[in-house]
Amino acid sequence: MSFVVTVPEAVAAAAGDLAAIGSTLREATAAAAGPTTGLAAAAADDVSIAVSQLFGRYGQEFQTVSNQLAAFHTEFVRTLNRGAAAYLNTESANGGQLFGQIEAGQRAVSAAAAAAPGGAYGQLVANTATNLESLYGAWSANPFPFLRQIIANQQVYWQQIAAALANAVQNFPALVANLPAAIDAAVQQFLAFNAAYYIQQIISSQIGFAQLFATTVGQGVTSVIAGWPNLAAELQLAFQQLLVGDYNAAVANLGKAMTNLLVTGFDTSDVTIGTMGTTISVTAKPKLLGPLGDLFTIMTIPAQEAQYFTNLMPPSILRDMSQNFTNVLTTLSNPNIQAVASFDIATTAGTLSTFFGVPLVLTYATLGAPFASLNAIATSAETIEQALLAGNYLGAVGALIDAPAHALDGFLNSATVLDTPILVPTGLPSPLPPTVGITLHLPFDGILVPPHPVTATISFPGAPVPIPGFPTTVTVFGTPFMGMAPLLINYIPQQLALAIKPAA
């Protein structure tokens, strides 16, 4: 077996030397161009005309060969630079990375748009109109769900109040007769109320929440400081890829750098494994680690506070309203992830459902539009560059004209996918697989992208024997992903409506 060892710095240095050689060649060509173009005009006799044509032909051939050599040299230097960047990227990947490379959702600019400049604008209008129609259709099917549920709850409360008043009127004589006893019982209950105990409990709970806040902030700051060197290295790699014209890879590494800073891993200790015959069922509740997970933990404190005070209230309409308010806070701040997978090893059939809390979906939607737009800009830049290198100047102009449309289409209607691997230990004995690998292909969606399922690749890394049919890519059921507009207009109001809906 043969191995090739490459030092990226040496490759980059070689590329620099070749670039210097290219500069020398260009200077020589320019120097030669002066004497061949600066000659006096030939005389009108036949001999002078023949000599002039001979030298003119050689001059044209010299310029043609020089241009071809310059183009070849430029492409060769670019290849070396990209090779150095690729080796650096490989070294970074071998050092261990949490998230995979970002796959561009729409990497290629259509050839038709390049041939007919401005075609991308028509596609932008068509995509935007389609997504707006989908957004309106989903909203009109269930308009203002949260507001309608609030109104429905008020109707229930008024019905309860009316029933209580009707009962009081119907039993008014008995209530009057029992009034002295009821007042005496209320006074006794008030005198027996242990105010000091509840005050102590409230103070203790507030101290606990304050400690949780301080500890979590400290962990987040520590994680950011620890991840800063890796961020700098990955940003340097992205910048180098940008310099050599590999714009999509630069955008991908920029996203990976920021993601690795905010999310350092997953806590997969909360796993439930079940087997029945050849079917393996796995229920995992991974928790985010890193600054983003710490931020989500801090976001849950108000909901915990609200739940604590709600629990102190006696059963009443006021408590029901307080519980609904608590449920709203919990829904908006719950960062939980739950993955439920079922695989039949014999038939390689299975299902996967993944449920994400609103903060996670909102985070992806917030970052989605800018990132998808940036990726579209990178794709247009590469298209322009490739067209120029190929001498297709019309195509370069067309791609330049269409670039703003592609950028806006990415911001509104496109998606860029980020691979998120999660390794879940099974704890199963050999020869069963010790680990289930779930690589979620999570999208960064444009603002108007309608709800859609995500996909995932299932594998069994470390299995004693290869399992036929794996790795395999499946459609993930559960929480859909979408752009910011359908998320805020439809999805979140629907989730809040479910949160305050009375139990059947």
From Swiss-Prot:
Exhibits vaccine potential. Immunogenicity is demonstrated in BALB/c mice. Interaction with TLR2 induces activation of human dendritic cells (DCs). Immunization with this protein induces a significant number of CD8+ T cells and a strong Th1-type response, with high gamma interferon (IFN-gamma) and low interleukin-4 responses, and activation of the bactericidal activity of macrophages. Identified T-cell epitopes may contribute to immunity against tuberculosis if included in a vaccine. Pfam families: PE. It is found in: Secreted, Cell wall. One of its GO terms (biological process) is symbiont-mediated suppression of host phagosome maturation. Signal peptide: none annotated. Keywords: Cell wall, Secreted, Virulence. InterPro entries: PE-PGRS_N. Interacts with host Toll-like receptor 2 (TLR2). This is PE-PGRS family protein PE_PGRS62. It comes from Mycobacterium tuberculosis (strain ATCC 25618 / H37Rv).
